[in-house]
Amino acid sequence: MKGMILFISCLLLIGIVVECKEGYLMDHEGCKLSCFIRPSGYCGRECGIKKGSSGYCAWPACYCYGLPNWVKVWDRATNKCGKK
């Protein structure tokens, strides 16, 4: 019983420590990475290039899961898309 509690505690701790982020990928101008006219699987490949676990086209932009913390994702609060 103690072993089971210890095992579950370790799993919870791993889930807290290995925290990944998710969000919309950005292009070089700070805009969401468009997938409007891209082929199927485009966003999954782009997310994989950024070391994400998966991604899909959340029309019309690429949304990724499991991204490392160093990857910049689009944020409404810090949006610089189309602004000079």
Curated annotation (Swiss-Prot):
Keywords recorded for this protein, A-Z: Amidation, Antimicrobial, Disulfide bond, Fungicide, Ion channel impairing toxin, Neurotoxin, Secreted, Signal, Toxin, Voltage-gated sodium channel impairing toxin
Subcellular location: Secreted
Domain LCN-type CS-alpha/beta as annotated: residue spans: 21-82
Comment, domains: Has the structural arrangement of an alpha-helix connected to antiparallel beta-sheets by disulfide bonds (CS-alpha/beta).
Protein name: Beta-mammal/insect toxin Ts1
GO molecular function, one term: sodium channel inhibitor activity
Disulfide bonds: 31-81, 35-57, 43-62, 47-64
Top-level lineage group: Eukaryota
Family classification: Belongs to the long (4 C-C) scorpion toxin superfamily. Sodium channel inhibitor family.
Function: Voltage-gated sodium channels (Nav) gating-modifier. Acts both as alpha- and beta-toxin, since it affects not only activation but also inactivation of Nav channels. Binds to Nav domain DII and impairs the four Nav channel voltage sensors movements. Depending on Nav channel subtypes tested, can also bind Nav domains DIII (low affinity) and DIV (very low affinity). Acts on almost all the Nav channels tested (mammalian Nav1.2/SCN2A, Nav1.3/SCN3A, Nav1.4/SCN4A, Nav1.5/SCN5A, Nav1.6/SCN8A, Nav1.9/SCN11A, and insect DmNav1). Is highly active against both mammals and insects.
InterPro entries for the chain: LCN-type_CS_alpha_beta_dom, Scorpion_toxin-like, Scorpion_toxin-like_sf, Scorpion_toxinL, Scorpion_toxinL/defensin
Additional remark text: Is the main neurotoxin of the venom of T.serrulatus.
Post-translational modification: C-terminal amidation is important for high activity.
A Pfam family that the UniProt record links to this protein: Toxin_3
Site (Important for activity) residue list: 32, 59, 74
Thermal profile of function: Optimum temperature is 25-60 degrees Celsius. All temperatures tested are optimal.
GO terms of biological process kind: defense response to fungus; killing of cells of another organism
Recorded effect of pH on activity: Optimum pH is 4.5-7.5. Is almost completely inactivated at pH 11.5.
Signal peptide: 1-20
